[in-house]
Swiss-Prot record:
Chain's role: Catalyzes the NADPH-dependent reduction of L-glutamate 5-phosphate into L-glutamate 5-semialdehyde and phosphate. The product spontaneously undergoes cyclization to form 1-pyrroline-5-carboxylate.
GO MF annotations, alphabetized: glutamate-5-semialdehyde dehydrogenase activity; NADP binding
Species this protein is from: Prochlorococcus marinus (strain SARG / CCMP1375 / SS120)
Highest classification ranks of the organism: Bacteria, Bacillati, Cyanobacteriota, Cyanophyceae, Synechococcales
Gene for this chain: proA
Pfam families: Aldedh
Entry's EC annotation: 1.2.1.41
Localization terms from the record: Cytoplasm
Group of enzyme by EC: oxidoreductase
Keywords, sorted A to Z: Amino-acid biosynthesis, Cytoplasm, NADP, Oxidoreductase, Proline biosynthesis
Family listed: Belongs to the gamma-glutamyl phosphate reductase family.
Catalyzed chemical reaction(s): L-glutamate 5-semialdehyde + phosphate + NADP(+) = L-glutamyl 5-phosphate + NADPH + H(+)
UniProt-recorded name of the protein: Gamma-glutamyl phosphate reductase
């Protein structure tokens, strides 16, 4: 049955703007590796030159958001400091230095004498990205799009509107000095335009939502365009009975507190019953000192946690200094809990038992499964992908942090010399199928 779409059709103006991006993306797909790299460097120079304007616009956005009562987690994502801007610009330079994802020959096969098949990576075309709060996402996404030969239509949250306008203005200035058309990137500014974007099938090839689970599901339900979903980040850390308690505490603190508003911060801590008391003796004062509110099940409350965890807490993404704690009897119970309440984002185990670690890594079906390290490593930049366009929690690829490799597809090229299928049907010719 055909999907029922509930959003309004795109306006003629939006269709025309999208067609401009589509046209520019065709030209961009023909640009050389050097041309795309040079364009990104020019973008970084323009962003650096306009940094004061960008930060001033962000300050205005943050002030307005505070006046409107935006929650602390979203305010944290919205705020763009000098350091965050510098890191974002450096991320673009790293993307420029990455290997070219276009034109990679994945398959080369002789089908018959002088009949050769190739499978070669090519850009997707035009990607549409809808995201909430984070203005640094504009730079990440645009750089990945240009590097991978794709046009990009961007729609940020209204709370970051002034910042996004200044960032895109700077990036377009950089592109205007390159061989790539500035129309390769386009910023949408209204909710009506973002709804219209969902109706641009035939022009837009992929939509990537970055935000709440509600946003992702709304987009999936209201577009015929393929969606690369990035939903809730309900991440877990399980601390096993065989463990270095001090190391496990360091991992837990980093996973929760290093940046609590991130989607790869843990929301639930699972403790083996044999170490729960001794671990919480160390952890409760450490977390209290950092301002973390612990919510525990009945057993963990008996070991000193004051606030009771409700059933809804196990499936809540706090994006804040809150952490649910549950005591389990085994790694199997921990994995069952993760399977029931997790979002298939990133889950970790702290243990010195290699067999337990192996079982956990091979059983937990998340896009990232870690052993003895923080969940905060679930990030394209930290993986060496450069900036990331998002994290996909779906099973089909691309999965996990999506960088350049997730923004290309492939095309089959077949070169012959007058070959016709009839000759193979009647036996005049046979397939050799030799990989070259």
């Amino acid at each position: 049955m055909e999907k029922q779409i509930l959003v309004p059709s795109p306006t003629d103006e939006l269709v025309n703007r999208a067609l401009e991006v589509k046209s520019a993306s065709v030209s961009l797909s023909q640009c050389s590796n050097d041309q795309r790299q040079s364009a990104l460097i020019l973008m970084t120079e323009a962003l650096s030159l306009r940094s004061s304007e960008i930060l001033k616009a962000n300050s205005d956005d943050v002030h307005r958001a505070e006046q409107e009562g935006l929650n602390q987690a979203l305010l944290s994502r919205l705020k763009l400091t000098e350091e965050k801007l510098r890191i974002s610009i450096e991320g673009i330079r790293q993307v420029a230095s990455l290997s070219d994802p276009i034109g990679i020959r994945q398959l080369h096969r002789e089908l018959n004498t002088n009949l050769y098949l190739q499978r070669v990576t090519v850009p997707l075309g035009v990607i549409g990205v809808i995201f909430e709060s984070r203005p640094d996402a504009v730079m990440q996404i645009a750089s990945l799009a240009i590097r991978s030969g794709n046009g990009a239509i961007l729609k940020g949250g209204s709370e970051a509107s002034l910042t996004n306008i200044e960032i895109v203005k700077a990036m377009k200035e950089g592109l205007s000095k390159s061989d790539i058309q500035p129309e390769s990137i386009c910023l949408l500014k209204t909710r009506q335009e973002s709804l219209g974007l969902l109706g641009l099938d035939g022009i837009v090839d992929l939509i990537i939502p970055r935000g709440s689970n509600e946003l992702v599901r709304f987009i999936q339900d209201n577009t015929r365009i393929p969606v690369l979903g990035h939903a809730d980040g309900i991440c877990h850390l399980y601390i096993d009975s065989a463990v270095n308690l001090n190391q496990a505490l360091d991992i837990a603190i980093d996973s929760k507190c290093q940046y609590p508003a991130a989607c790869n911060a843990i929301e639930t801590l699972l403790l083996h019953k044999d170490i729960a008391a001794s671990f919480l003796k160390l952890a409760i004062p450490a977390f209290e000192k950092l301002g973390v509110t612990l919510l525990g099940d009945e057993l963990s409350q008996s070991f000193g946690i004051i606030t009771k965890a409700e059933e809804s807490d196990w499936s809540t993404e706090y994006l804040d200094l809150k952490l649910s704690v549950k005591v389990v009897s085994s790694v199997d119970e921990a994995m069952l809990h993760i399977r029931r309440y997790g979002s298939r984002h990133t889950d970790a185990i702290a243990t010195t038992n290699k067999e337990i670690a192996r079982r956990f890594l091979r059983t937990v079906d998340s896009s990232g499964v870690y052993h003895n390290c923080s969940t905060r490593f679930a990030d394209g930049f930290r993986y060496g992908f450069g900036a990331e366009v998002g994290i996909s929690t779906q099973t089909l690829p691309p999965r996990g942090p999506v960088g350049l490799d997730g923004l290309v597809t492939y095309r089959y090229f077949l070169e012959g010399d007058g070959h016709i299928a009839e000759d193979f049907s009647n036996g005049k010719k046979t397939f050799s199928h030799i990989d070259l």
